[in-house]
């Protein structure tokens, strides 16, 4: 018999200490990694529920195990809410991650060796969009597109490459691009060469759900996303479509299960269902609008302080600070800010002369600070602290002063009150 009062704290103090330390770190550090966010206690409640015990291979009403009547309800709720949120006619909520969702799309639509047009990782793309170290770059013939000298996606070059190489699939989406993507233009190019248009909206899904960033679902054949990042749900993946193509939907379902996964994680799917319900609330739209306002305020402040922002600013939740020409690498900037309790990630910038392990930039995002309650004033103050650290990265006194200021603002804006 399992007793409900069994706890980690009294049984595994080493593990509990690590959990406690991480909880304190999240409360006492300012989180600016663009792909991170704070999920709600409701989502964590779902993820810690008895649903974790249930195997449910298959799909609602078509399972390979008995006893699935209640998890069918859970998954159906998640599916219907996802479709409502993004204007889709199809949703698969089973992918364990965004990368596995992307893998399923490749499996459903392509054969190994097929040509794919995807955004260059060095220009803001993602590993799964064709990086040579990823399955996508190993199994398929990848033709990269990128940004022009202004830092914007070069659609004319994209079209030229599409006409020349005749890809079977084109990929839209990014992990480090601060502009607005013209999904309609991408679909025009895809249609011109007879390619599938697949969009990975993982980074901007929350903004899209709230209507503050263009929705790719009406334009793409298939759309994938993570369910965390700006969407602020549990860590997981999602596949959507509004193509009204039942054969396509069957291929996508089969590519997830049994093609790439076994049993779905029902406790995570329950967390997705809760997160989708939260994203349908009016407050979520207010939150996402503030995410963009805060990002714009930060980008403008960086520029005022003499720092270069790739693309000249931001229209979403993130920005890339370009450190080329400064006596400071992305790795050093990351480390210095960490000493001041500000968490970012080093990131390559276009035409970066340094390796991906060192880089000449840092990526900054506002979803997590906005979740804490930061508005423009706090975002501007924070950016000035960041610039103080970068300007004085080898000055321990400056780092210590900024750290105390960070601790103070974190106390005033707790993650979980």
Swiss-Prot record:
Keywords annotated in UniProt: Amino-acid biosynthesis, Cytoplasm, One-carbon metabolism, Pyridoxal phosphate, Transferase
Site feature location: Plays an important role in substrate specificity: 228
GO biological process, one term: glycine biosynthetic process from serine
EC number(s) given by UniProt: 2.1.2.1
Subunit structure: Homodimer.
InterPro entries assigned to the protein according to its UniProt record, in alphabetical order: PyrdxlP-dep_Trfase, PyrdxlP-dep_Trfase_major, PyrdxlP-dep_Trfase_small, Ser_HO-MeTrfase, Ser_HO-MeTrfase-like, Ser_HO-MeTrfase_PLP_BS, SHMT-like_dom
Main location: cytoplasm
Highest taxon listed in the record's lineage: Bacteria
Cell location: Cytoplasm
Function field: Catalyzes the reversible interconversion of serine and glycine with tetrahydrofolate (THF) serving as the one-carbon carrier. This reaction serves as the major source of one-carbon groups required for the biosynthesis of purines, thymidylate, methionine, and other important biomolecules. Also exhibits THF-independent aldolase activity toward beta-hydroxyamino acids, producing glycine and aldehydes, via a retro-aldol mechanism.
Record's protein name: Serine hydroxymethyltransferase
Chain positions recorded as (6S)-5,6,7,8-tetrahydrofolate binding sites: 121, 125-127, 355-357
PTM-bearing positions, type N6-(pyridoxal phosphate)lysine: 229
GO terms assigned for molecular function: glycine hydroxymethyltransferase activity; pyridoxal phosphate binding
Pfam families xrefs: SHMT (PF00464)
Cofactor(s) needed by this chain: pyridoxal 5'-phosphate
Pathway, per record: One-carbon metabolism; tetrahydrofolate interconversion; Amino-acid biosynthesis; glycine biosynthesis; glycine from L-serine: step 1/1
Similarity annotation: Belongs to the SHMT family.
Catalytic reaction(s) noted: (6R)-5,10-methylene-5,6,7,8-tetrahydrofolate + glycine + H2O = (6S)-5,6,7,8-tetrahydrofolate + L-serine
A GO term from the CC aspect: cytosol
Organism: Aeromonas hydrophila subsp. hydrophila (strain ATCC 7966 / DSM 30187 / BCRC 13018 / CCUG 14551 / JCM 1027 / KCTC 2358 / NCIMB 9240 / NCTC 8049)
SUPFAM superfamilies: PLP-dependent transferases
Keyword Transferase belongs to the record: yes
């Amino acid at each position: 018999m399992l007793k409900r009062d069994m706890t980690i704290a009294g049984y595994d103090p080493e593990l509990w200490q690590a959990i406690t330390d991480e909880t304190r770190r999240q409360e006492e550090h300012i989180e600016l990694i663009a792909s991170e966010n704070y999920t709600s206690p409701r989502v964590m409640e779902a993820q810690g529920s008895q649903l974790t015990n249930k195997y449910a291979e298959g799909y609602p009403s078509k399972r390979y195990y008995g006893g699935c009547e209640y998890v069918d309800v859970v998954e159906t709720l998640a599916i219907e809410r996802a479709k409502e949120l993004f204007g889709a006619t199809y949703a698969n909520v089973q992918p364990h991650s965004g990368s596995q969702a992307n893998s399923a799309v490749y499996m459903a639509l392509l054969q190994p060796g097929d040509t794919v047009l995807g955004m260059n990782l060095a220009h803001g793309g993602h590993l799964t969009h064709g990086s040579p170290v990823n399955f996508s770059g190993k199994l398929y013939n990848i033709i990269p597109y990128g940004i022009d000298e202004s830092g914007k996606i070069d659609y004319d070059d994209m079209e030229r490459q599409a006409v020349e190489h005749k890809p079977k699939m084109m990929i839209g989406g990014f992990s480090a691009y601060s502009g607005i993507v013209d999904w309609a233009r991408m679909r025009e190019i895809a249609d011109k060469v007879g390619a599938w248009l697949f969009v990975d909206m993982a980074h901007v899904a929350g903004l899209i759900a709230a209507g503050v960033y263009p929705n790719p679902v009406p334009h793409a054949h298939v759309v994938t996303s993570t369910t965390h990042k700006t969407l602020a749900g549990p860590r997981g993946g999602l596949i959507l479509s509004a193509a009204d193509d039942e054969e396509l939907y069957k291929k996508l379902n089969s590519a997830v299960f049994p093609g790439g996964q076994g049993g779905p994680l029902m406790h995570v799917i329950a967390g997705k269902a809760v997160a989708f319900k939260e994203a349908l609330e009016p407050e979520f739209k207010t939150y996402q609008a503030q995410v963009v306002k805060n990002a714009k305020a930060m980008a403008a402040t960086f520029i005022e302080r003499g720092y270069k922002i790739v693309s000249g600013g931001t229209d979403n939740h993130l920005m890339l600070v370009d450190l080329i020409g400064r006596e400071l690498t992305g790795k050093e900037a990351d480390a210095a800010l960490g000493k001041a309790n500000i968490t970012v990630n080093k990131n390559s910038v276009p035409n970066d002369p340094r390796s991906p392990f060192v880089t000449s930039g840092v990526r900054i995002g506002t979803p997590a600070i906005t979740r804490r309650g930061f508005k423009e004033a706090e975002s501007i103050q924070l950016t000035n602290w960041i610039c103080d650290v970068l300007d004085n990265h080898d000055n321990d006194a400056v780092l210590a002063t900024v750290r105390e200021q960070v601790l103070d603002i974190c106390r005033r804006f707790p993650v979980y009150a």
